[in-house]
Swiss-Prot record:
SMART domains according to UniProt: IGc1
Main function: Constant region of immunoglobulin heavy chains. Immunoglobulins, also known as antibodies, are membrane-bound or secreted glycoproteins produced by B lymphocytes. In the recognition phase of humoral immunity, the membrane-bound immunoglobulins serve as receptors which, upon binding of a specific antigen, trigger the clonal expansion and differentiation of B lymphocytes into immunoglobulins-secreting plasma cells. Secreted immunoglobulins mediate the effector phase of humoral immunity, which results in the elimination of bound antigens.
Domain of life: Eukaryota
Protein name: Immunoglobulin heavy constant epsilon
Subcellular location: Secreted; Cell membrane
GO terms for MF: immunoglobulin receptor binding; MHC class II protein complex binding; peptide antigen binding
Principal location listed in the UniProt entry: secreted
Amino acid sequence: VSVKAPSLYPLKPCSSENTASVTLGCLVKDYFPDPVTVTWYSDSLNTSTMNFPSIGSDLKTTTSQMTSWGKSAKNFTCHVTHAPSTFVSDLTIRARPVNITKPTVDLLHSSCDPNAFHSTIQLYCFVYGHIQNDVSIHWLMDDRKIYETHAQNVLIKEEGKLASTYSRLNITQQQWMSESTFTCKVTSQGENYWAHTRRCSDDEPRGVITYLIPPSPLDLYENGTPKLTCLVLDLESEENITVTWVRERKKSIGSASQRSTKHHNATTSITSILPVDAKDWIEGEGYQCRVDHPHFPKPIVRSITKAPGKRSAPEVYVFLPPEEEEKDKRTLTCLIQNFFPEDISVQWLQDSKLIPKSQHSTTTPLKYNGSNQRFFIFSRLEVTKALWTQTKQFTCRVIHEALREPRKLERTISKSLGNTSLRPSQASM
Protein backbone atom coordinates (compact mmCIF):
# COMPACT_ATOMS: atom_id res chain seq x y z
CA VAL A 1 0.00 0.00 0.00
CA SER A 2 1.35 3.42 -0.93
CA VAL A 3 1.44 6.39 1.39
CA LYS A 4 -2.04 7.81 1.96
CA ALA A 5 -3.22 10.81 3.99
CA PRO A 6 -6.03 10.30 6.53
CA SER A 7 -9.61 11.54 6.57
CA LEU A 8 -10.95 13.17 9.75
CA TYR A 9 -14.44 12.79 11.26
CA PRO A 10 -15.90 14.31 14.47
CA LEU A 11 -17.46 12.07 17.12
CA LYS A 12 -19.91 13.56 19.62
CA PRO A 13 -22.81 12.30 21.77
CA CYS A 14 -26.20 11.92 20.10
CA SER A 15 -27.92 13.52 23.10
CA SER A 16 -27.00 15.91 25.88
CA GLU A 17 -27.47 14.14 29.20
CA ASN A 18 -27.57 15.99 32.48
CA THR A 19 -24.03 14.98 33.50
CA ALA A 20 -21.03 16.90 34.75
CA SER A 21 -18.86 16.04 31.74
CA VAL A 22 -18.94 15.73 27.97
CA THR A 23 -16.84 13.37 25.85
CA LEU A 24 -15.88 14.03 22.22
CA GLY A 25 -13.86 12.01 19.74
CA CYS A 26 -11.78 12.44 16.62
CA LEU A 27 -11.83 9.58 14.08
CA VAL A 28 -8.70 9.37 11.91
CA LYS A 29 -9.40 6.96 9.07
CA ASP A 30 -7.91 5.38 5.94
CA TYR A 31 -4.26 6.41 6.25
CA PHE A 32 -0.97 4.56 5.70
CA PRO A 33 1.49 4.00 7.24
CA ASP A 34 1.62 4.63 10.97
CA PRO A 35 2.05 6.80 12.92
CA VAL A 36 -0.33 9.73 13.24
CA THR A 37 -0.11 12.28 16.03
CA VAL A 38 -3.32 13.63 17.57
CA THR A 39 -3.26 16.66 19.84
CA TRP A 40 -6.25 18.41 21.44
CA TYR A 41 -6.66 22.14 22.04
CA SER A 42 -9.45 23.89 23.97
CA ASP A 43 -10.20 26.89 26.17
CA SER A 44 -11.00 24.56 29.06
CA LEU A 45 -8.40 23.66 31.67
CA ASN A 46 -10.37 20.76 33.13
CA THR A 47 -9.94 18.09 30.42
CA SER A 48 -8.42 14.66 29.87
CA THR A 49 -7.46 12.90 26.61
CA MET A 50 -6.94 9.31 25.49
CA ASN A 51 -5.46 8.08 22.20
CA PHE A 52 -6.27 4.56 21.04
CA PRO A 53 -3.93 2.27 19.04
CA SER A 54 -4.48 2.01 15.31
CA ILE A 55 -6.21 -0.97 13.71
CA GLY A 56 -6.14 -2.39 10.18
CA SER A 57 -3.52 -4.32 8.23
CA ASP A 58 -3.55 -2.11 5.14
CA LEU A 59 -5.28 1.24 5.61
CA LYS A 60 -5.15 2.31 9.24
CA THR A 61 -7.81 3.75 11.54
CA THR A 62 -7.43 5.27 14.98
CA THR A 63 -9.44 7.40 17.37
CA SER A 64 -8.69 9.95 20.03
CA GLN A 65 -11.04 11.06 22.77
CA MET A 66 -11.30 14.12 25.01
CA THR A 67 -13.45 14.51 28.13
CA SER A 68 -14.24 17.95 29.52
CA TRP A 69 -15.89 18.98 32.80
CA GLY A 70 -17.90 22.19 33.01
CA LYS A 71 -21.22 23.79 32.13
CA SER A 72 -20.26 26.11 29.29
CA ALA A 73 -20.24 25.38 25.57
CA LYS A 74 -16.67 25.02 24.33
CA ASN A 75 -14.86 24.56 21.04
CA PHE A 76 -12.36 21.71 20.94
CA THR A 77 -9.78 21.33 18.18
CA CYS A 78 -8.35 17.98 17.15
CA HIS A 79 -4.93 18.62 15.54
CA VAL A 80 -3.76 15.70 13.38
CA THR A 81 -0.30 15.23 11.85
CA HIS A 82 0.64 12.38 9.50
CA ALA A 83 4.34 12.79 8.76
CA PRO A 84 4.65 10.18 5.95
CA SER A 85 2.13 12.08 3.78
CA THR A 86 2.99 15.54 5.21
CA PHE A 87 -0.69 15.83 6.18
CA VAL A 88 -1.54 18.43 8.85
CA SER A 89 -5.11 19.43 9.63
CA ASP A 90 -7.38 20.76 12.38
CA LEU A 91 -10.91 19.56 13.09
CA THR A 92 -12.94 21.78 15.42
CA ILE A 93 -15.75 20.11 17.38
CA ARG A 94 -18.23 22.14 19.35
CA ALA A 95 -19.42 20.57 22.59
CA ARG A 96 -22.94 21.19 23.71
CA PRO A 97 -22.93 22.53 27.28
CA VAL A 98 -24.32 20.39 30.05
CA ASN A 99 -27.12 21.73 32.25
CA ILE A 100 -27.85 24.35 29.59
CA THR A 101 -30.55 26.94 30.25
CA LYS A 102 -32.64 27.08 27.10
CA PRO A 103 -34.39 30.41 26.53
CA THR A 104 -37.81 30.67 24.93
CA VAL A 105 -37.83 32.66 21.67
CA ASP A 106 -41.05 34.15 20.25
CA LEU A 107 -41.22 36.22 17.05
CA LEU A 108 -44.24 38.49 16.60
CA HIS A 109 -45.16 41.19 14.09
CA SER A 110 -47.47 44.17 13.95
CA SER A 111 -50.48 44.26 11.63
CA CYS A 112 -49.60 43.10 8.14
CA ASP A 113 -52.90 44.22 6.62
CA PRO A 114 -52.03 45.28 3.04
CA ASN A 115 -55.02 47.64 3.14
CA ALA A 116 -53.22 49.75 5.73
CA PHE A 117 -51.12 52.68 4.52
CA HIS A 118 -48.41 52.45 7.16
CA SER A 119 -45.02 52.24 5.48
CA THR A 120 -43.34 50.05 8.09
CA ILE A 121 -44.02 46.80 9.92
CA GLN A 122 -42.51 46.07 13.32
CA LEU A 123 -41.02 42.67 14.11
CA TYR A 124 -40.57 41.79 17.80
CA CYS A 125 -38.28 38.99 18.99
CA PHE A 126 -38.89 38.12 22.65
CA VAL A 127 -36.24 36.04 24.47
CA TYR A 128 -37.44 34.74 27.84
CA GLY A 129 -35.31 33.03 30.50
CA HIS A 130 -31.75 33.55 29.26
CA ILE A 131 -28.64 33.82 31.41
CA GLN A 132 -28.00 37.46 32.35
CA ASN A 133 -25.52 39.28 30.10
CA ASP A 134 -25.24 36.20 27.88
CA VAL A 135 -27.50 36.80 24.90
CA SER A 136 -27.05 38.30 21.44
CA ILE A 137 -29.82 38.87 18.91
CA HIS A 138 -29.34 39.21 15.16
CA TRP A 139 -31.88 39.64 12.36
CA LEU A 140 -31.78 37.95 8.97
CA MET A 141 -33.78 38.37 5.79
CA ASP A 142 -33.72 35.23 3.65
CA ASP A 143 -30.71 34.03 5.68
CA ARG A 144 -28.76 37.25 5.09
CA LYS A 145 -27.91 39.55 7.98
CA ILE A 146 -29.91 42.78 8.17
CA TYR A 147 -28.35 46.18 8.83
CA GLU A 148 -27.98 46.20 12.62
CA THR A 149 -28.85 49.86 13.28
CA HIS A 150 -32.45 49.13 12.29
CA ALA A 151 -32.80 46.91 15.37
CA GLN A 152 -33.35 47.95 18.97
CA ASN A 153 -32.58 45.55 21.85
CA VAL A 154 -34.26 46.17 25.22
CA LEU A 155 -33.87 44.34 28.55
CA ILE A 156 -37.36 43.58 29.90
CA LYS A 157 -36.67 42.20 33.38
CA GLU A 158 -34.26 40.21 35.55
CA GLU A 159 -35.32 37.35 37.82
CA GLY A 160 -32.48 35.86 39.83
CA LYS A 161 -29.84 34.62 37.40
CA LEU A 162 -32.21 34.79 34.42
CA ALA A 163 -33.37 37.71 32.31
CA SER A 164 -35.74 38.47 29.45
CA THR A 165 -34.99 40.68 26.46
CA TYR A 166 -36.70 41.75 23.26
CA SER A 167 -35.42 43.13 19.97
CA ARG A 168 -37.48 45.25 17.59
CA LEU A 169 -36.85 45.57 13.86
CA ASN A 170 -38.64 47.92 11.47
CA ILE A 171 -39.08 46.74 7.88
CA THR A 172 -40.91 48.26 4.93
CA GLN A 173 -44.20 47.07 3.49
CA GLN A 174 -42.35 46.24 0.29
CA GLN A 175 -39.91 43.98 2.14
CA TRP A 176 -42.80 42.26 3.90
CA MET A 177 -44.87 41.77 0.74
CA SER A 178 -41.83 40.33 -1.07
CA GLU A 179 -42.58 37.04 0.75
CA SER A 180 -39.11 37.01 2.24
CA THR A 181 -38.50 35.04 5.42
CA PHE A 182 -37.38 37.07 8.43
CA THR A 183 -35.39 35.33 11.13
CA CYS A 184 -34.49 36.26 14.69
CA LYS A 185 -31.24 34.48 15.60
CA VAL A 186 -30.52 34.26 19.33
CA THR A 187 -27.19 33.11 20.77
CA SER A 188 -26.98 32.21 24.46
CA GLN A 189 -24.40 30.05 26.26
CA GLY A 190 -22.80 29.43 22.89
CA GLU A 191 -25.99 27.84 21.50
CA ASN A 192 -28.09 29.24 18.65
CA TYR A 193 -31.88 29.48 18.55
CA TRP A 194 -34.05 30.67 15.66
CA ALA A 195 -37.56 31.97 15.16
CA HIS A 196 -38.98 32.71 11.70
CA THR A 197 -41.85 34.68 10.20
CA ARG A 198 -43.07 35.88 6.83
CA ARG A 199 -46.02 37.80 5.40
CA CYS A 200 -49.50 36.86 6.53
CA SER A 201 -51.17 34.17 4.47
CA ASP A 202 -54.02 35.51 2.43
CA ASP A 203 -56.55 34.53 -0.19
CA GLU A 204 -54.94 36.13 -3.21
CA PRO A 205 -55.39 34.12 -6.40
CA ARG A 206 -52.48 31.84 -7.12
CA GLY A 207 -50.29 32.76 -10.03
CA VAL A 208 -51.36 36.41 -10.29
CA ILE A 209 -48.42 38.67 -9.43
CA THR A 210 -48.74 42.39 -8.69
CA TYR A 211 -45.97 44.97 -8.33
CA LEU A 212 -46.21 48.63 -7.34
CA ILE A 213 -43.32 50.69 -8.70
CA PRO A 214 -42.37 54.13 -7.28
CA PRO A 215 -41.62 57.24 -9.38
CA SER A 216 -38.15 57.36 -10.89
CA PRO A 217 -35.87 60.19 -9.71
CA LEU A 218 -35.67 61.29 -13.35
CA ASP A 219 -39.43 61.86 -13.52
CA LEU A 220 -39.57 63.23 -9.98
CA TYR A 221 -36.76 65.82 -10.10
CA GLU A 222 -35.89 66.33 -13.77
CA ASN A 223 -39.03 65.89 -15.87
CA GLY A 224 -41.49 66.96 -13.18
CA THR A 225 -43.87 64.14 -14.13
CA PRO A 226 -43.70 61.59 -11.29
CA LYS A 227 -45.92 58.56 -11.66
CA LEU A 228 -46.69 55.29 -9.92
CA THR A 229 -46.90 52.07 -11.91
CA CYS A 230 -49.05 49.10 -10.93
CA LEU A 231 -48.01 46.02 -12.90
CA VAL A 232 -50.24 42.93 -12.86
CA LEU A 233 -48.79 39.74 -14.38
CA ASP A 234 -49.92 36.24 -15.34
CA LEU A 235 -53.60 36.98 -15.94
CA GLU A 236 -55.67 34.71 -18.17
CA SER A 237 -57.14 37.80 -19.87
CA GLU A 238 -57.96 41.43 -19.15
CA GLU A 239 -61.69 40.75 -19.17
CA ASN A 240 -63.49 41.93 -16.00
CA ILE A 241 -60.23 43.00 -14.35
CA THR A 242 -60.48 46.34 -12.56
CA VAL A 243 -57.52 48.36 -11.30
CA THR A 244 -58.28 51.25 -8.93
CA TRP A 245 -56.11 53.69 -7.01
CA VAL A 246 -56.61 55.11 -3.50
CA ARG A 247 -54.77 57.84 -1.56
CA GLU A 248 -54.00 57.60 2.13
CA ARG A 249 -55.44 61.03 2.93
CA LYS A 250 -58.59 60.33 0.92
CA LYS A 251 -57.95 63.38 -1.25
CA SER A 252 -58.89 63.50 -4.90
CA ILE A 253 -56.76 61.38 -7.16
CA GLY A 254 -55.87 61.87 -10.81
CA SER A 255 -56.89 59.69 -13.72
CA ALA A 256 -54.77 56.63 -14.36
CA SER A 257 -53.91 55.32 -17.81
CA GLN A 258 -54.06 51.59 -18.42
CA ARG A 259 -52.88 49.19 -21.09
CA SER A 260 -52.85 45.43 -21.47
CA THR A 261 -50.32 43.21 -23.21
CA LYS A 262 -50.70 39.63 -24.41
CA HIS A 263 -47.62 37.45 -24.14
CA HIS A 264 -46.34 34.37 -25.97
CA ASN A 265 -47.06 32.12 -22.99
CA ALA A 266 -50.79 32.88 -23.35
CA THR A 267 -50.89 35.19 -20.32
CA THR A 268 -51.89 38.84 -20.14
CA SER A 269 -50.33 41.68 -18.17
CA ILE A 270 -51.93 44.98 -17.22
CA THR A 271 -50.01 48.19 -16.57
CA SER A 272 -51.79 51.04 -14.77
CA ILE A 273 -49.94 54.37 -14.50
CA LEU A 274 -51.04 57.05 -12.04
CA PRO A 275 -49.57 60.59 -12.21
CA VAL A 276 -48.83 61.91 -8.71
CA ASP A 277 -47.89 65.27 -7.27
CA ALA A 278 -44.16 65.51 -6.59
CA LYS A 279 -44.66 67.41 -3.33
CA ASP A 280 -47.17 64.85 -2.03
CA TRP A 281 -44.80 61.97 -2.76
CA ILE A 282 -41.76 63.68 -1.22
CA GLU A 283 -43.76 64.50 1.93
CA GLY A 284 -44.66 60.82 2.39
CA GLU A 285 -48.16 60.48 0.96
CA GLY A 286 -49.31 56.85 0.71
CA TYR A 287 -51.00 55.21 -2.28
CA GLN A 288 -52.69 51.89 -2.96
CA CYS A 289 -53.30 49.91 -6.12
CA ARG A 290 -56.23 47.48 -5.90
CA VAL A 291 -56.75 44.75 -8.46
CA ASP A 292 -60.09 42.92 -8.53
CA HIS A 293 -62.01 40.34 -10.54
CA PRO A 294 -65.36 38.63 -9.88
CA HIS A 295 -63.54 35.30 -9.45
CA PHE A 296 -60.98 36.63 -6.95
CA PRO A 297 -61.73 35.70 -3.32
CA LYS A 298 -60.73 39.26 -2.43
CA PRO A 299 -58.92 42.15 -4.15
CA ILE A 300 -55.14 42.17 -4.47
CA VAL A 301 -53.88 45.27 -2.65
CA ARG A 302 -50.43 46.83 -2.86
CA SER A 303 -49.39 49.89 -0.81
CA ILE A 304 -46.46 52.24 -1.31
CA THR A 305 -44.93 55.36 0.21
CA LYS A 306 -41.54 57.02 0.05
CA ALA A 307 -38.98 54.59 1.51
CA PRO A 308 -38.02 55.37 5.13
CA GLY A 309 -34.40 55.49 6.28
CA LYS A 310 -31.35 57.74 6.41
CA ARG A 311 -30.53 59.18 2.98
CA SER A 312 -27.08 58.74 1.48
CA ALA A 313 -25.86 60.51 -1.67
CA PRO A 314 -24.21 58.43 -4.41
CA GLU A 315 -20.54 58.47 -5.33
CA VAL A 316 -19.89 58.37 -9.09
CA TYR A 317 -16.82 57.04 -10.91
CA VAL A 318 -16.28 56.62 -14.67
CA PHE A 319 -13.66 54.22 -16.00
CA LEU A 320 -11.68 54.46 -19.23
CA PRO A 321 -12.11 51.70 -21.84
CA PRO A 322 -9.82 48.70 -21.29
CA GLU A 323 -6.77 48.76 -23.51
CA GLU A 324 -7.26 45.16 -24.67
CA GLU A 325 -10.80 45.80 -25.93
CA GLU A 326 -11.77 44.92 -29.50
CA LYS A 327 -10.41 47.47 -31.94
CA ASP A 328 -13.75 48.69 -33.37
CA LYS A 329 -15.49 49.59 -30.09
CA ARG A 330 -14.86 51.22 -26.73
CA THR A 331 -16.82 50.54 -23.52
CA LEU A 332 -17.24 53.18 -20.81
CA THR A 333 -18.30 52.06 -17.36
CA CYS A 334 -19.92 54.18 -14.65
CA LEU A 335 -19.88 52.92 -11.05
CA ILE A 336 -22.45 54.51 -8.73
CA GLN A 337 -22.16 53.41 -5.11
CA ASN A 338 -23.03 54.03 -1.45
CA PHE A 339 -26.50 55.48 -2.06
CA PHE A 340 -29.82 55.10 -0.26
CA PRO A 341 -32.66 54.69 -1.04
CA GLU A 342 -32.28 52.42 -4.04
CA ASP A 343 -34.37 54.57 -6.42
CA ILE A 344 -31.92 56.18 -8.85
CA SER A 345 -31.78 57.32 -12.49
CA VAL A 346 -28.75 57.25 -14.79
CA GLN A 347 -28.25 59.10 -18.09
CA TRP A 348 -25.36 59.30 -20.55
CA LEU A 349 -24.47 62.38 -22.59
CA GLN A 350 -22.14 62.98 -25.53
CA ASP A 351 -20.81 66.53 -25.73
CA SER A 352 -23.68 67.61 -23.42
CA LYS A 353 -26.31 65.98 -25.66
CA LEU A 354 -28.48 63.23 -24.20
CA ILE A 355 -27.78 59.73 -25.53
CA PRO A 356 -30.96 57.62 -26.06
CA LYS A 357 -31.64 55.14 -23.28
CA SER A 358 -31.63 52.28 -25.78
CA GLN A 359 -27.92 52.80 -26.40
CA HIS A 360 -26.73 52.11 -22.86
CA SER A 361 -27.59 49.66 -20.09
CA THR A 362 -27.72 49.89 -16.31
CA THR A 363 -27.97 47.14 -13.72
CA THR A 364 -30.68 47.07 -11.09
CA PRO A 365 -29.55 48.41 -7.70
CA LEU A 366 -27.54 45.84 -5.76
CA LYS A 367 -27.25 45.81 -1.98
CA TYR A 368 -23.90 45.50 -0.25
CA ASN A 369 -23.27 42.31 1.70
CA GLY A 370 -23.04 42.51 5.45
CA SER A 371 -24.34 45.34 7.60
CA ASN A 372 -24.27 48.12 4.99
CA GLN A 373 -27.78 49.04 3.86
CA ARG A 374 -26.55 51.08 0.89
CA PHE A 375 -26.71 50.17 -2.79
CA PHE A 376 -24.52 50.25 -5.89
CA ILE A 377 -25.06 49.89 -9.65
CA PHE A 378 -23.08 49.80 -12.87
CA SER A 379 -23.97 51.58 -16.10
CA ARG A 380 -22.34 50.66 -19.41
CA LEU A 381 -22.03 52.73 -22.59
CA GLU A 382 -20.53 51.29 -25.77
CA VAL A 383 -19.22 53.72 -28.41
CA THR A 384 -17.28 53.33 -31.63
CA LYS A 385 -13.54 53.75 -31.71
CA ALA A 386 -14.01 56.67 -34.10
CA LEU A 387 -16.13 58.63 -31.62
CA TRP A 388 -13.70 57.93 -28.82
CA THR A 389 -10.64 59.04 -30.81
CA GLN A 390 -12.41 62.26 -31.94
CA THR A 391 -11.94 63.55 -28.37
CA LYS A 392 -15.67 63.46 -27.76
CA GLN A 393 -16.69 64.03 -24.16
CA PHE A 394 -18.99 61.50 -22.49
CA THR A 395 -20.83 62.19 -19.26
CA CYS A 396 -22.45 59.85 -16.76
CA ARG A 397 -25.28 61.76 -15.05
CA VAL A 398 -26.92 60.47 -11.87
CA ILE A 399 -30.19 61.71 -10.38
CA HIS A 400 -30.94 60.85 -6.75
CA GLU A 401 -32.98 62.43 -3.96
CA ALA A 402 -30.06 62.61 -1.50
CA LEU A 403 -28.10 64.95 -3.77
CA ARG A 404 -28.32 68.71 -3.34
CA GLU A 405 -30.47 70.71 -5.72
CA PRO A 406 -30.89 70.12 -8.62
CA ARG A 407 -30.47 66.47 -7.45
CA LYS A 408 -27.93 65.73 -10.21
CA LEU A 409 -24.31 64.62 -10.20
CA GLU A 410 -22.13 64.28 -13.32
CA ARG A 411 -18.78 62.75 -14.15
CA THR A 412 -17.27 63.49 -17.59
CA ILE A 413 -14.59 61.52 -19.42
CA SER A 414 -12.78 61.70 -22.76
CA LYS A 415 -9.69 60.23 -24.36
CA SER A 416 -7.73 63.49 -24.15
CA LEU A 417 -8.91 64.74 -20.75
CA GLY A 418 -9.34 61.50 -18.80
CA ASN A 419 -11.64 61.89 -15.79
CA THR A 420 -12.85 65.41 -14.99
CA SER A 421 -14.22 66.76 -11.75
CA LEU A 422 -17.69 66.20 -10.37
CA ARG A 423 -20.42 68.70 -11.03
CA PRO A 424 -22.26 69.74 -8.92
CA SER A 425 -21.37 68.86 -5.30
CA GLN A 426 -22.18 65.31 -4.24
CA ALA A 427 -22.91 66.29 -0.62
CA SER A 428 -26.08 64.74 0.78
CA MET A 429 -29.10 66.53 2.10
